[in-house]
Amino acid sequence: MGCIEHKSQPAESAKTDEHSFNSKGEMQPRAPETPSKEFKNGKVVKVNDVTPKGVYRPDYKILTPNMRSPEYVQMSTAAAITLGVTNGKMYRCDCTRCLNLLLTYPEGCRANCAYCGLARHREAERDYADRNFIRVDWPSVPTEKIIDIVAKDGDQTPFHRMCISMITHPRSDADTLTVLKMWTDKISPETVPVSILSNPTTKTTGDVRQLKELGADIFTVALDAATPELFDRTRGKGVQSPHSWKKYWQILESARDIYGKNKFGAHIIVGMGETEFEVLNLVQQLVDMGGHSHMFCFFPEKGSLMDHLPATPKSQWRRVQLARYLIDYCDVRVEHMKFDSEGRVVDYGMGASELSNIIDDGTAFRTSGCPGKVRDDISACDRPYGDSPVSDISSYPFKLNKKDIKKARKQLNIPVVQNT
């Protein structure tokens, strides 16, 4: 989708203010505490050993059942509503187009990422199946039940994509393969394409290849942090977590070689202390590799080591959203752009009129992720309100209306271009 003429956007129409970004100095996670032995590795759930009965909705007033993959998986609240296994409504959304599945075990995720509600340090506070993740609860559902519902719907399924999300657990690699095979045995990848959100820490190149052979369409890696330093601070040794930047990139490069152009990507969280220049250089690097970036706006997750920190300012988020869209889909390069002394975008490397048209289209401000069945630049993984409240939406899970676009333009501080 080449769509632009590379002319400079006048700097005065992309003004920034001095407090419009989250700086590295302020975005410091708390130090993790070590849970006492009686709470480690899901001990409470395993000792009680409550037999699961169908769908389990997080409930802190009852004993959490002993559920584990591949027999059980968790799913986002939006997916559970769309599938019909739980009741609820979503603001301005009839459904979600991506069936997000999350592997689950009483031991939980053994990583300790600072921004994540599933992190290991929460063992004493909350059983794994009851923890919030990207702002919502994740009901646990028998895997066969999910597959049977989607298979029965056939071509009429509301889902344009399914994604298996791994966690850091000794069984996660093998169980991802099992869940994928259970799915593709009954549902054609042509009906519902499959993505893998991987855990590179335990992955090998052989694992990456085997997932493709079993029917996975897109392979993604959650880098999340935009620089090696921030990665180590939030996902590695800085928070007593096992992940490494080097291993994540090794698996990402394997995915490039095995899946091919436009069939791999990386998640990036904006606003954890990186500059806009740094994150957009990463976006450019991914595009040059043949992949895509899937952007998230930092929002302090309750119970995480960063829940005391500010959400990404909307001005910073909108600038990065817009610039990322231009790099990913409009043939603009980061070298065409200009940045101020704080690394903020002040020139998008595009003529004012063309840029204004892209803003007015609104697609740049929608949730980014793996594509569905509409357009390559419209994500099936719409994650309703996963990074903001409905009162001030960061990633729009639906087509923006004129009022939404007006608000996004105001947050960008880019005026409407008057046609002469």
Predicted regions and their residues:
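Auxiliary Fe-S-binding modules of radical SAM enzymes
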Residues: 1-97, 280-420
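N-terminal pre-triad scaffold of radical SAM enzymes
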Residues: 72-122, 161-164
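Short glycine-centered, acidic/aromatic-flanked micro-motifs in structured strand/loop junctions
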Residues: 103, 166, 198, 268-270
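Core AdoMet radical
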Residues: 121-145, 149-175, 190-207, 211-249, ...
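Generic structural signal for well-ordered alpha-helices
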Residues: 147-150, 177-184, 208-209, 249-253, ...
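Short beta-strand/loop segments at the ligand-binding rim of alpha/beta enzyme cores
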Residues: 188-198, 259-268
